[in-house]
């Protein structure tokens, strides 16, 4: 990356052409994750936020972002059904990294949802999609609005699933630019980053959980399974936050 790309620029606007966006992605493909973050902070519009599931290797993105912008808002959409280990992991990372955590939840409590709709996650793809919209998509949309987010950092990686395999580094999604600094990282890359920076995996990693969401729709990795098979009974990979064309 040249010095000019790291200097503070007039932020990009959402009316950028597809051709110009493609050129930027060509440039970003040739840079490191840390250089992508630096470029984004200098070239993409405020407010910058990062979303986190506080999953298996989430400490990587949280550490990388807070090293250069310590007070960056960290958005968690809490369904009320995270593993107990996840809630403890959140507390640990908030303390260790001094995170500026913003927790968003559905307007309707999890108990009320079950009373009204039953266990949506047991009602096939349609039920799962409704559950995700209530508990993840709508709270995240609210976070983006209330935090006036112009740029959204997320830790998606191409190796995680078929649906993520062709993602660019930078996208326009809804009213935000969305940047994936570690899009081309492998599990080995993540391992060494965690080790080099004295960061921990999620506690359930050692029990074979490679993708960690709600306890009722997350399985440990078994022989013959891919990472994407461990979520939502293999029916879906995406929870809705990172699906494209749904306005978020």
Curated annotation (Swiss-Prot):
Assigned GO CC terms: cytoplasm
Listed EC numbers: 1.8.4.8
Parts forming coiled coils: none
Gene Ontology terms describing biological process: hydrogen sulfide biosynthetic process; sulfate assimilation, phosphoadenylyl sulfate reduction by phosphoadenylyl-sulfate reductase (thioredoxin)
Species for this entry: Alteromonas mediterranea (strain DSM 17117 / CIP 110805 / LMG 28347 / Deep ecotype)
Name of this protein: Phosphoadenosine 5'-phosphosulfate reductase
A GO MF label: phosphoadenylyl-sulfate reductase (thioredoxin) activity
A UniProt-annotated Pfam family: PAPS_reduct
Family recorded in the similarity comment: Belongs to the PAPS reductase family. CysH subfamily.
UniProt catalytic activity: [thioredoxin]-disulfide + sulfite + adenosine 3',5'-bisphosphate + 2 H(+) = [thioredoxin]-dithiol + 3'-phosphoadenylyl sulfate
Active site: 239 (nucleophile)
Keyword Cytoplasm in annotation: yes
Xref: NCBIfam families: cysH, PAPS_reductase, PRK02090.1
Name of encoding gene: cysH1
Gene3D superfamilies, sorted: HUPs
PANTHER family per UniProt: PHOSPHOADENOSINE PHOSPHOSULFATE REDUCTASE (PTHR46509:SF1)
Matches recorded under InterPro entries: PAPS/APS_Rdtase, PAPS_reduct_dom, PAPS_reductase_CysH, Rossmann-like_a/b/a_fold
Pathway(s) annotated for this protein in UniProt: Sulfur metabolism; hydrogen sulfide biosynthesis; sulfite from sulfate: step 3/3
